[in-house]
A protein has these predicted regions:
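Acidic/His-rich active-site region of diverse nucleotide-sugar glycosyltransferases
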Residues: 3-49, 55, 64
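Glycine-rich phosphate/pyrophosphate-binding loop
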Residues: 11-23, 32, 157-195
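A cytosolic small-molecule/anion-sensing beta-strand core signal
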Residues: 27, 59, 72
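Short, cationic motifs built from Arg/Lys/His that form the positively charged side of catalytic pockets
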Residues: 34-35, 60, 99
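A cross-family signal for key residues in well-ordered alpha-helices
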Residues: 39, 59, 103
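Short, conserved glycine- and acidic-residue-centered signature motifs
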Residues: 50-51, 92
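Short active-site alpha-helical segment characteristic of glycosyltransferases
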Residues: 54-60, 76
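Active-site-adjacent helix/loop segment of glycosyltransferases
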Residues: 63-161, 165-173, 179
């Protein structure tokens, strides 16, 4: 089973996730998709690099009326961090930038309004945390991500319009509405107890 990790701690696999089920997204390291669906939705976003392109596609698939499923009986071997190391400022940049772009493209108007208020505060906190740790390159990467995201606004608006035109489905009930990190810090150490 794909390991669930939060704050570099991995939840023990005790068979709690052995059933196939619908999920919001699956890891690109273990991703299979019908070719006709992949082509119809334009595949992975060419503007994303190595981070969140699979989440973006899974979100778009569901908005277009398709399902995303996890099949735990599968076996996949994957070298994590093979493209970029965990502490790489480039990884921090792509994580922040691509996540902002994905949210802008795929989220509902209400979700986007919440993100517009909360996200700058959270990203500023993340940047300041990097600075306090002496990781100035990661601090700057967060602001570069915002700069690039804001420059993309025109092309992202076009992509958002295309996604909305294909919209026949919903992700209602599939997106967790709380903070996984906060629940973890409050003592709910397994994903089963967080949800």
């Amino acid at each position: 089973m794909y390991k669930r990790q939060i704050l570099k701690r991995v939840e023990a696999d005790e068979g709690q996730y052995d059933d196939a089920r619908d999920v919001f997204w699956v890891s690109g390291a273990a991703f299979c998709c019908r070719a006709d669906v992949f082509r119809a939705l334009g595949g992975f976003d060419d503007d994303f690099f190595a981070h969140m392109e699979e989440i973006d596609l899974c979100w778009r698939m569901q908005l277009a009326g398709y399902r995303v499923r996890v099949v735990p009986g599968s076996t996949v071997y994957h070298l994590g961090g093979g493209t970029l190391t965990t502490d790489s400022p480039t990884k921090v940049f792509y994580n922040h930038r691509n996540n902002l772009a994905m949210l802008y493209k795929c989220a509902s108007p209400v979700q986007r309004a919440v993100v517009a208020i909360v996200r700058p505060v959270l990203d500023l906190m993340a940047a300041l945390s990097y600075l306090a740790q002496g990781r100035g390159d990661n601090f700057r990467a967060v602001f570069r991500a915002w700069r690039d995201f804001l420059r993309w606004h025109g092309s992202l608006s076009c992509k958002r319009k295309e996604i909305r035109q294909q919209c026949r489905g919903t992700v209602a009930g599939k997106v967790y509405r709380g903070s996984v990190l906060l629940r973890y810090l409050l003592g709910r150490k397994t994903f089963g107890r967080m949800m």
